[in-house]
Amino acid sequence: MANSHFKHTSVLLDEAVNGLNIRENGIYIDGTFGRGGHSRLILSQLGTEGRLIAIDRDPQAIEVAKAITDPRFSIVHGPFSKLAHYTEKAGLIGKIDGVLLDLGVSSPQLDDPERGFSFMRDGPLDMRMDPTRGQSAAEWLMNATADDIAWVLKTFGEERFAKRIARAIVACNQEEPITRTKALADLIAQASPIKEKHKHPATKSFQAIRIYINSELEEIEQALEGALQVLAPQGRLSVISFHSLEDRIVKRFIRQNSRGPQVPAGLPLTEEQLKARGGRSLKSIGKMKPSEEEVADNPRARSSVLRFAEKVSE
């Protein structure tokens, strides 16, 4: 069952949907349904022939989505990395007018102790966005080497004490398995020789483990490639990211596809290369950050960045 009592406020709600430039009878994909904030706003702007396909890999989000009885709406349970696959099954490749992606973990996932995402609330050390698939954080930490753990903490959390924390985790697991979020958070705090002001010592490590367990960065890369594949000419891409690792991927993807294929300079070009030289797939529309008012109302919005792009006519 969905835990509807955990509130979720969609960040940059109006801005992200406005960036899609909704067409009354268009077909849209909300790749991260969550609790449906973006989906409901998109539906409110669609006409009778419009259509919205939502995707989420969290079973709790799927339960919320099932309550929407609008015939223009459909929900798919799965990762957004497969959005091109879902679109192909529906016979809609190249016909999608807009794709919206709201990256990272949602407030209900963070706020529900049973999901195991938060170091602020004690719960089982899980961290899976889809608890029915893959290994939990506790299972991975139990079987991983100190080198593997340190690499994850450094790569996905930019944790300066990654090796020290990793050794402490392995040593603790050899004595007694770490199965609770509070136990892991306390262990990380003890292993961190320097504490940052106004920041829990476990912040970066929890982010890193969560990203690794859910393959979040690979998911984003595949979702962006899929979005480019399914969009119609003039179709819009609207992406909200919440930390630099996510935003770096989105920014690089839009930039690379706005430039077109790179060909060697100063060499005779084939006919195919000449065609490719001027070709580009996306046009960057720009980016936005939340207003001071939104950040004051929802502090989790502080680090968010919204980027827009448009599919170039073929």
From Swiss-Prot:
<keyword id="KW-0698">rRNA processing</keyword>
<feature type="region of interest" description="Disordered">
    <location>
        <begin position="278"/>
        <end position="300"/>
    </location>
</feature>
<dbReference type="InterPro" id="IPR023397">
    <property type="entry name" value="SAM-dep_MeTrfase_MraW_recog"/>
</dbReference>
<dbReference type="InterPro" id="IPR002903">
    <property type="entry name" value="RsmH"/>
</dbReference>
<feature type="binding site">
    <location>
        <position position="102"/>
    </location>
    <ligand>
        <name>S-adenosyl-L-methionine</name>
    </ligand>
</feature>
<dbReference type="Pfam" id="PF01795">
    <property type="entry name" value="Methyltransf_5"/>
</dbReference>
<dbReference type="GO" id="GO:0005737">
    <property type="term" value="C:cytoplasm"/>
</dbReference>
<feature type="binding site">
    <location>
        <position position="80"/>
    </location>
    <ligand>
        <name>S-adenosyl-L-methionine</name>
    </ligand>
</feature>
<feature type="binding site">
    <location>
        <position position="109"/>
    </location>
    <ligand>
        <name>S-adenosyl-L-methionine</name>
    </ligand>
</feature>
<dbReference type="GO" id="GO:0070475">
    <property type="term" value="P:rRNA base methylation"/>
</dbReference>
<keyword id="KW-0808">Transferase</keyword>
<keyword id="KW-0489">Methyltransferase</keyword>
<comment type="similarity">
    <text>Belongs to the methyltransferase superfamily. RsmH family.</text>
</comment>
<dbReference type="InterPro" id="IPR029063">
    <property type="entry name" value="SAM-dependent_MTases_sf"/>
</dbReference>
<protein>
    <recommendedName>
        <fullName>Ribosomal RNA small subunit methyltransferase H</fullName>
        <ecNumber>2.1.1.199</ecNumber>
    </recommendedName>
</protein>
<dbReference type="GO" id="GO:0071424">
    <property type="term" value="F:rRNA (cytosine-N4-)-methyltransferase activity"/>
</dbReference>
<feature type="binding site">
    <location>
        <position position="56"/>
    </location>
    <ligand>
        <name>S-adenosyl-L-methionine</name>
    </ligand>
</feature>
<keyword id="KW-0949">S-adenosyl-L-methionine</keyword>
<feature type="binding site">
    <location>
        <begin position="36"/>
        <end position="38"/>
    </location>
    <ligand>
        <name>S-adenosyl-L-methionine</name>
    </ligand>
</feature>
<feature type="compositionally biased region" description="Basic and acidic residues">
    <location>
        <begin position="289"/>
        <end position="300"/>
    </location>
</feature>
<comment type="function">
    <text>Specifically methylates the N4 position of cytidine in position 1402 (C1402) of 16S rRNA.</text>
</comment>
<keyword id="KW-0963">Cytoplasm</keyword>
